[in-house]
């Protein structure tokens, strides 16, 4: 008996986009004739199978038959269908401290296919043995941003720009941006200098400016939406199936309070922003402004510190490095968080 599966043109485009752009694939089985991959994705705005809840467990069988590649897809235990495509490119991604992952791309639209069997997938196992994207991973893969490159990344303002300039997307809180490029995502963000990170004691959180400003202003009250994890993160390595607490490693954090003036509740992380004992507020907006602001402009154009009277105080600059993280780690960070993913997809 032949099993047929098809989908409309719109569904074909969105499914292809989801599988290519929102999933990092782990090889879980193979034989001479097939490969089986697994991915765990956070909730998606373009692809939502039934009962997806807050995350989507994707299982994919891939094999070649009669001149085309056949994809058999199962999501959250429900078989979605099988589809044909002319070409499949599998890109192996080896990342320090992480298991090998794959990115899949499909040459042409996903079309209807016919198979003579009902696909069977491997049993799903879930493990917390992999720590995901840790500070060690970030410091290993990040690169300092040269000043000439930083000047070409516009983060505020519009109007006439140099043809070499590119506009980045601001990610929620302070000091983090994403630049979508044809070759993939590039994340730009401020992070504590490595020497300071190794001496500060906390080796679990990624000490981004975004995270530390949120920690400094967190009120800690039960039910505060700014201080509570949104519970939508997933493990980008696919080892753990389900939603996980973020553990201070995402760039989705925002200050607890108005972006223009958030009260400092926790002194220890606040010391990374200002030397003065008079510091009362942290601001996710700069004490200086201009019609156009680039990453090459000073830190005073991106953040600020105020005293109790609302006067601007000097911002610490020597403790921060402006770094960039590129594919595939940038995509893993974005696609493990529904907040970040919705900003750029």
Swiss-Prot record:
Main location: virion
Ranges where the record places region Nuclear export signal: 55-63
Keyword ATP-binding: no
Residues in the signal sequence: none
Start and end residues of each stretch annotated as Nuclear localization signal 1: 26-35
GO process terms (BP): symbiont-mediated suppression of host innate immune response
Assigned keywords, A-Z: Host cytoplasm, Host nucleus, Host-virus interaction, Inhibition of host innate immune response by virus, Late protein, Viral immunoevasion, Virion, Virion tegument
Region entry Nuclear localization signal 2, spans: 90-94
Localisation per UniProt entry: Virion tegument; Host cytoplasm; Host nucleus
GO cellular component, one term: host cell viral assembly compartment
Keyword field contains Oxidoreductase: no
A Pfam family: Herpes_UL16
Functional note: Plays a critical role in cytoplasmic virus egress. Participates in the final step of tegumentation and envelope acquisition within the host cytoplasm by directly interacting with the capsid. Upon virion binding to target cell, a signaling cascade is triggered to disrupt the interaction with the capsid, thereby preparing capsid uncoating. Additionally, antagonizes the viral DNA-triggered antiviral immune response by targeting host STING1 and preventing its dimerization and trafficking.
HAMAP family documented for this protein: HSV_CEP2
Subunit structure: Interacts with cytoplasmic envelopment protein 3 and with the capsid. Interacts with host STING1; this interaction prevents viral DNA-triggered antiviral immune response.
Family membership: Belongs to the herpesviridae cytoplasmic envelopment protein 2 family.
Protein name: Cytoplasmic envelopment protein 2
Organism expressing this protein natively: Human cytomegalovirus (strain Merlin)
């Amino acid at each position: 008996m032949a099993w047929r599966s098809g989908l409309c043109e719109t569904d074909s485009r969105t499914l292809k986009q989801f599988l290519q752009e929102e999933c990092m694939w782990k090889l879980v089985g193979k034989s001479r004739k097939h490969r089986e991959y697994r991915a765990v994705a956070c909730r998606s705005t373009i692809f939502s199978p039934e009962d997806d809840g807050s995350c989507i467990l994707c299982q994919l069988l891939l094999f070649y038959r009669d001149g085309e590649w056949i994809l058999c897809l199962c999501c959250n235990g429900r078989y979605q269908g099988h589809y044909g495509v002319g070409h499949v490119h599998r890109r192996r991604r080896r990342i320090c401290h992480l298991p090998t992952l794959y990115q899949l791309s499909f040459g042409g639209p996903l079309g209807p296919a016919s198979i003579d069997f009902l696909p069977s997938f491997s049993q799903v196992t879930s493990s917390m043995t992999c720590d995901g994207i840790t500070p060690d991973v970030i410091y290993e893969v990040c690169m300092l941003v040269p000043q000439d490159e930083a000047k070409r990344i516009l983060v505020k303002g519009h109007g006439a720009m140099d043809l070499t300039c590119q506009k980045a997307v601001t990610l929620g809180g302070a000091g983090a941006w994403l630049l979508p490029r044809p070759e993939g995502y590039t994340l730009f963000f401020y992070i504590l200098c490595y020497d300071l990170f190794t001496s500060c004691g906390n080796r679990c959180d990624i000490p981004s400016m975004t995270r530390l400003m949120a920690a400094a202003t967190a009120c800690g009250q039960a039910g505060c939406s700014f201080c509570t994890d949104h519970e939508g993160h997933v493990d980008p390595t696919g080892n753990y199936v389900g939603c996980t607490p973020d553990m201070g490693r995402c760039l989705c954090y925002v200050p607890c309070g108005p972006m223009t003036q958030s009260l400092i509740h926790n002194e220890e992380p606040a010391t990374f922003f200002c030397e003065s004992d008079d510091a009362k507020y942290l601001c996710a907006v700069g004490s200086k402004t201009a019609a156009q602001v680039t990453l090459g402009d000073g830190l005073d154009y991106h953040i600020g510190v105020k005293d109790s009277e609302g006067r601007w105080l000097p911002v610490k600059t020597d403790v921060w490095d402006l770094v960039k993280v590129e594919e595939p780690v940038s995509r893993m960070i974005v696609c493990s968080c529904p907040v970040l993913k919705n900003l750029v997809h």
